[in-house]
Amino acid sequence: MVLNRYSLITNCNHKTLGLYYLWFSFLFGSYGFLLSVILRTELYSSSLRIIAQENVNLYNMIFTIHGIIMIFFNIMPGLFGGFGNYFLPILCGSPELAYPRINSISLLLQPIAFVLVILSTAAEFGGGTGWTLYPPLSTSLMSLSPVAVDVIIFGLLVSGVASIMSSLNFITTVMHLRAKGLTLGILSVSTWSLIITSGMLLLTLPVLTGGVLMLLSDLHFNTLFFDPTFAGDPILYQHLFWFFGHPEVYILILPAFGVISHVISTNYCRNLFGNQSMILAMGCIAVLGSLVWVHHMYTTGLEVDTRAYFTSTTILISIPTGTKVFNWICTYMSSNFGMIHSSSLLSLLFICTFTFGGTTGVILGNAAIDVALHDTYYVIAHFHFVLSIGAIIGLFTTVSAFQDNFFGKNLRENSIVILWSMLFFVGVILTFLPMHFLGFNVMPRRIPDYPDALNGWNMICSIGSTMTLFGLLIFK
């Protein structure tokens, strides 16, 4: 597809906008990934290496921006925006999305939100709050620059508005513009993954918006929502944030489920094993995933009954998730199981890494274990296996499987693609697998220094990060 000079601001075609979402995703994701390479360069050995002692807040600023960019500006625009915009009307038999101009506006809001978040680095101390923006650190006028927190909040608000507009667009398209005779019961798994994701966004994003606006008013308008000195409660913000933050994980991964299901089904010319159960499993994941946000807060002093409920419900999510994994494997086994295309290989890698990441999530879901492993590198290893490896491989699978549609070129049989896949996979495994052992050795996250005894594992992690960088250069 040829994109002319002004098509970014004048085009309302869903395919063109989907391609722009993908380009923005890779552009923003490259920036976020390079920030993570800086972090791993700092952590390749104990003591401070490339960050000066008097400027150690730079480390906090880097991992804050890295987290926000990779979640809100890499995975979401790529999988939800790119895959959704390009394929949802096609899968519904609709000529176009319901509101093409609103779709165009939501795309144009993405770079604006990205620039706002990046501007926080230009403030005096930067926004070193972590991507969670916890008070009282984010509301303190003494330890940080409030301007940095302001622009991060505005960036998240703009990104949230764009996501809500896309969600309304997708749901309206499916409900009112699908082809005649195409009932909801026979829609594909990919379509349902986008519908459920849109519903979760509409449910949870207003709560995040309310939470960050309360932060903003605490900073500038003398409210005391989160100030315990005046009967405020910083734990309230954690509830508001994680009510969005945990469903956000499923918002990121559900479109990847749709992509993987579509790729496995089409590459092997097989119907998905248990097609309806796959849709039901995604619905169960969405409902249960919205009811377990407190498992991020086991160390905040919860009652025993509360911890028991959230532990059991968290572990319960493994049932529908396991259903999906077994159905994918059964679909593979009903075929000749050959690696027909690179997208088939990437799909298999996704299943392996997502299963491993989900298994460590079941371990962390146990309140007694999580108290010991909370805020250690075990947590980082867990969610990077699901997101950094799982969702990102889902994004690359999208590009690999549909490159004919996107670019009019077919590189599936190119050996460089297989080389890139293996180099990237080995790199990310080397990066994140040793972090489990660092977590068991109680290495705290968000700290740029650590004991000399942990040098070996950290060196392996940094080597893996460098391998991943070379793999991505090959992909480019």
From Swiss-Prot:
The UniProt record lists the keyword Magnesium: yes
Family matches, as InterPro entries: Cyt_c_oxase-like_su1_dom, Cyt_c_oxase-like_su1_sf, Cyt_C_Oxase_1, Cyt_c_Oxase_su1_BS
Enzyme Commission number(s) of this protein: 7.1.1.9
TM stretches of this protein: 19-39, 61-81, 105-125, 151-171, 194-214, 240-260, 278-298, 310-330, 345-365, 379-399, 415-435, 455-475
Enzyme class of the recorded protein, top EC level: translocase
Subcellular location: Mitochondrion inner membrane
CC cofactor: heme; Cu cation
Binding site for Mg(2+): H374, D375
GO CC annotation: mitochondrial inner membrane; respiratory chain complex IV
Catalysed reactions, semicolon-separated: 4 Fe(II)-[cytochrome c] + O2 + 8 H(+)(in) = 4 Fe(III)-[cytochrome c] + 2 H2O + 4 H(+)(out)
UniProt function note: Component of the cytochrome c oxidase, the last enzyme in the mitochondrial electron transport chain which drives oxidative phosphorylation. The respiratory chain contains 3 multisubunit complexes succinate dehydrogenase (complex II, CII), ubiquinol-cytochrome c oxidoreductase (cytochrome b-c1 complex, complex III, CIII) and cytochrome c oxidase (complex IV, CIV), that cooperate to transfer electrons derived from NADH and succinate to molecular oxygen, creating an electrochemical gradient over the inner membrane that drives transmembrane transport and the ATP synthase.
Family: Belongs to the heme-copper respiratory oxidase family.
Protein name, as recorded: Cytochrome c oxidase subunit 1
Lineage of the organism: Eukaryota, Sar, Alveolata, Apicomplexa, Aconoidasida
The gene coding this protein: MT-CO1
